[in-house]
């Protein structure tokens, strides 16, 4: 009976514990289950010991022929209790196995959740990468389209460059730049302004440059001509010693502070300039300036010419800040001596505007160019080449400031004026090239399926307008059209500029042939006839008045900025 009561008590306790387990955590349930297993295992051992004791008692009673019914009943009860205990142990072990399985399942679930989170993050990252890649692809396609257009433009510029031979440069200089120069600096545009690849100054330019507006003294004329000849041939090893020997002789006979010494210093400065020795040339010009100020006075035109030449030289060395006050002083002298509306004042204003432009002083640049433009239009007329050149310079300044509309207006004015001068008043049947280029741009979509566009025959004849300024304007306006996305209009102007350059070079070749034939013919002329012919050539040269100073700084095909170094126009 004691065993039965013990089993009942254990079962009641077990039921109570199981009831409590429903409110326990998983760890507490596992801990309690382990405790129950230990208790059941102990109880099983106790029951087995009691059962073994009863079985031994039964054997003893049977030997004595006693009554074993009571003992057998107890033994049966104990066997049932042991079976129940074993069942409980099995259930507890199953619960432990289930608990372990649940723990493993929970761990797997947490692992899967972590993988899901990681996959979600990777998915979000991949979406971002896809969006970025699509954006980059779109930008790349846009860049490819832009590069293709730039490639076409560069191919055009390469075609233009093929015709920019040294022969063409020399002849263009003769046509547009052999004027009365103070120092006669040649065009640096074709070599990028690099002193190591400078070409010699033209003889006529050097001749005018040497004197700075003063007549060459008779005693220096022969030496002067020799130096010019050697320097123009690039034979500086002969020209420089000649100049130095002449300087030494002049200083011995006349002293250092003599106008003739200043003239020879100018000649030597020009030779040094052609060699790219800008520092030595500047020192000589400063010396010449001091002599002329002492001997001729601070407000003499020759002083203004030397100041201007020195400013040009500083500009070529990139010393724009040092060049500006020299240029301003030259402007003041020329205004005082020549008057505020003289063309040489306009030249000086152009120089000053360019120096300010290289320093980013665009308000002053616009003011100087506009005043120069007013002077040229008033004194020389709207068809003078200087008007178109100054408009180009002003347009270049507008471009550097991003004022594309104002620049476009000026370029169109230049082309319209050149067209009217060549072909008459503009009307529906006589349109300048820029109008026809814009018509092509507007009609591009209409003929995009391969249908041929109308043949604009009139713009082909406009190619005959072969002024260097007009050709430059065509290229600049074409570059502006490209910036605006008007590629058809840009290609039209570029083709026109290319044809114009080819036409101009053909004229140059024919002129050279004529000059050679004329030279042979002049041998048979009388001195009077030769003098008349030389006078015509000189007048043709003197009609031009600018020297290229540097390329446009922003990389576009803008107007090559001009820095004039001219002496006074005759009033």
Swiss-Prot record:
Residues 54-160 form a coiled coil. Residues 167-210, 518-571 are annotated as: Disordered. Residues 167-177, 526-544, 551-562 have a biased composition (Basic and acidic residues). It is found in: Cytoplasm, Cytoskeleton. SUPFAM superfamilies: TPR-like. Pfam families: TPR_10, TPR_12. GO terms for biological process: microtubule-based movement. TPR repeats lie at residues 220-253, 262-295, 304-337, 346-379, 388-421, 471-504. The keyword Cytoplasm applies. GO terms for cellular component: cytoplasm; kinesin complex; microtubule. GO terms for molecular function: kinesin binding. Keywords: Coiled coil, Cytoplasm, Cytoskeleton, Microtubule, Motor protein, Repeat, TPR repeat. The light chain is composed of three structural domains: a large globular N-terminal domain which may be involved in binding to kinesin heavy chains, a central alpha-helical coiled-coil domain that mediates the light chain dimerization; and a small globular C-terminal which may play a role in regulating mechanochemical activity or attachment of kinesin to membrane-bound organelles. Oligomeric complex composed of two heavy chains and two light chains. Belongs to the kinesin light chain family. Kinesin is a microtubule-associated force-producing protein that may play a role in organelle transport. The light chain may function in coupling of cargo to the heavy chain or in the modulation of its ATPase activity. This is Kinesin light chain. It comes from Doryteuthis pealeii (Longfin inshore squid). The lineage of its organism: Eukaryota, Metazoa, Spiralia, Lophotrochozoa, Mollusca.
